[in-house]
Amino acid sequence: MARREFGKGARRCRRCGDTHGVIQKYGIMLCRQCFREVAEKMGFKKYN
């Protein structure tokens, strides 16, 4: 099977491999669920 080059399937989460809800901004490349788990370790602050 050929590697995907375009579309949502081409971008995968670095942590779990999911293709849904991937955050690409600033080169994060994590799905939103994984991002919520590791955001504080990455230096993001959580506000109310």
UniProtKB/Swiss-Prot annotation:
It comes from the Archaea. PROSITE patterns: RIBOSOMAL_S14 (PS00527). InterPro entries: Ribosomal_uS14, Ribosomal_uS14_arc, Ribosomal_uS14_CS, RIbosomal_uS14_euk_arc, Ribosomal_uS14_sf. GO terms for cellular component: cytosolic small ribosomal subunit. GO terms for molecular function: rRNA binding; structural constituent of ribosome; zinc ion binding. Transmembrane segments: none annotated. Binds 1 zinc ion per subunit. Zn(2+) binds at residues 13, 16, 31, 34. Its cofactor is Zn(2+). One of its GO terms (biological process) is cytoplasmic translation. Keywords: Metal-binding, Ribonucleoprotein, Ribosomal protein, RNA-binding, rRNA-binding, Zinc. Part of the 30S ribosomal subunit. Belongs to the universal ribosomal protein uS14 family. Zinc-binding uS14 subfamily. Binds 16S rRNA, required for the assembly of 30S particles. This is Small ribosomal subunit protein uS14.
